[in-house]
């Protein structure tokens, strides 16, 4: 092998296109886009023998696993023999000069790059000969081609405990943990999530990222937890509401009992008041009957006394009696034809009135006049007005 040709060395060190395909990267758990690998003419010549073997994951035939592993060259030996720090090809510009001193090596901690590939095609071939190996580790010390693996999928410096997985020769198979490949975020799960995942029979890794199925399971579990929490909250609110209603009912029932007691007391008081009222009504009825009888007797007595006493007081006694000198004749307002009977009646009435008005001496004179008239064979004639009436009749 001529190591002086840098392009051929690059072509040999360049993996096939479908090594870092999307499926291989997803199987490794590396959620990063596959790098675009530029294919040159010499790379096509170097990979022509690989691609002609078959359509497996690495482009290998089932009978050529050893030849595939021999194609990888340890870059540490190449850089250790003759390599300049500024040259990316891994060889010096003048490989024919054996007298050139080797380039001084850096005193800093060695930088190691590992490319991990899941060789699924090799599992079937190595099933009978030995244990199956799922990962291939290739050490690329101090050689960082940008077209192979992006920066997010590479580890610039390995920890000290990672040197235990580094084998002295390239192409050897060694299991490399995922923590040494890229910095992963830790997945924190609560006790409830762990319990539900255990019930589902699913065990999630402790680091992100997760696969689609694992994400679906985790979302389902968290949705169950949220539904459970919301149901618990609703039950708690319902219980608080019911407790509040029960407390209000208890308070209302206690107040109702107190009011019932007050109502009973008021009813008893009302009954006593009604009994007292009836007693008063009976007493008033008895006293009212007695008073009515007494008052009736008093009124009858007073009325009888009034009937006895009032006739003795005549209202005509205070008036002076009219004498004959006080009499004045009046003119006749109308001419009437009077019969003898009417004349006598009128005369009698006038005589009675005159006698009542005349003093006692005049009464004696009237009596003598009456007797005189009776002796003459006729009724006594009134004086004054009576003579005027008779004179009018005669006319």
Curated annotation (Swiss-Prot):
Q: Which SMART domains match?
A: BRLZ
GO terms of molecular function:
DNA-binding transcription factor activity, RNA polymerase II-specific; RNA polymerase II cis-regulatory region sequence-specific DNA binding
Which regions face the Cytoplasmic side of the membrane?
Answer: 1-295
Q: Which InterPro entries match?
A: bZIP (IPR004827), bZIP_sf (IPR046347), CREB_ATF_subfamily (IPR051381)
CDD domains given in the database record: bZIP_CREB3
A GO cellular component term found in this entry reads:
nucleus
User: Could you name the domain of life of the organism this protein comes from?
Assistant: Eukaryota
Q: What topology does the record note for this protein and the membrane?
A: Single-pass type II membrane protein
Where does the record place the region Disordered?
79-110, 354-387
UniProt GO BP: response to unfolded protein
Q: Which residues lie within the region annotated Leucine-zipper?
A: 259-280
Q: Where is this region: Basic motif?
A: 219-248
Keyword tags: Activator, DNA-binding, Endoplasmic reticulum, Glycoprotein, Membrane, Nucleus, Signal-anchor, Transcription, Transcription regulation, Transmembrane, Transmembrane helix, Unfolded protein response
Site described as Cleavage, located at: 338-339
Q: State which residues carry a glycan (glycosylated).
A: 366
Family matches, as PANTHER family: AGAP001464-PB, CYCLIC AMP-RESPONSIVE ELEMENT-BINDING PROTEIN 3-LIKE PROTEIN 4
Similarity comment text for this entry: Belongs to the bZIP family. ATF subfamily.
Record-given protein name: Cyclic AMP-responsive element-binding protein 3-like protein 4
């Amino acid at each position: 092998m001529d190591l002086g040709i840098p392009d051929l060395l690059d072509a040999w060190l360049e993996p096939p296109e479908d090594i870092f395909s999307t499926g291989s990267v997803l199987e490794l758990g590396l959620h990063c886009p596959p790098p675009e690998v530029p294919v040159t003419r010499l790379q096509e010549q170097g990979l022509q023998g690989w691609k002609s073997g078959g359509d497996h994951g690495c482009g290998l035939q089932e009978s050529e696993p050893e030849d595939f592993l021999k194609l990888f060259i340890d870059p540490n030996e190449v850089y250790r023999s003759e390599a300049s720090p500024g040259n990316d090809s891994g060889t010096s510009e003048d490989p024919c000069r054996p007298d050139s001193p080797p380039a001084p090596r850096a005193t800093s901690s060695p930088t190691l790059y590992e490319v991990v590939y899941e060789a699924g095609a090799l599992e079937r071939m190595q099933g009978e000969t030995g244990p199956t190996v799922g990962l291939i580790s290739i050490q690329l010390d101090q050689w960082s081609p940008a077209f192979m693996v992006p920066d997010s999928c590479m580890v610039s410096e390995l920890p000290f405990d990672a040197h235990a997985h580094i084998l002295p020769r390239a192409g050897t198979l060694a299991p490399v943990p995922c923590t040494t490949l890229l910095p992963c975020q830790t997945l924190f799960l609560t006790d409830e999530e762990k319990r539900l995942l255990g019930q589902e029979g699913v065990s999630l890794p402790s680091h992100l990222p997760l696969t689609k199925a694992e994400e679906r399971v985790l979302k389902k579990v968290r949705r169950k937890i949220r539904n459970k929490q919301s149901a618990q909250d609703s039950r708690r609110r319902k219980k608080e509401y019911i407790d509040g209603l029960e407390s209000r009912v208890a308070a209302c029932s206690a107040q109702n009992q107190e009011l019932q007691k007050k109502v009973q007391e008021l009813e008893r008081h009302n009954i006593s008041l009604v009994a007292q009222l009836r007693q008063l009504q009976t007493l008033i009825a008895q006293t009212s009957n007695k008073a009515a009888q007494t008052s009736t007797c008093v009124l009858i007595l007073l009325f009888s006394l009034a009937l006895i006493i009032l006739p003795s007081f005549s209202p005509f006694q205070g008036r002076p009696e009219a004498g004959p000198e006080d009499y004045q004749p009046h003119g006749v307002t109308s001419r009437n034809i009077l019969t003898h009977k009417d004349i006598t009646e009128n005369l009698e009435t006038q005589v009675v009135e005159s006698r009542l008005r005349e003093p006692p001496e005049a009464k004696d004179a009237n009596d003598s006049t009456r007797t005189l008239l009776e002796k003459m064979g006729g009724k006594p004639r009134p004086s004054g007005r009576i003579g005027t009436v008779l004179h009018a009749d005669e006319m």
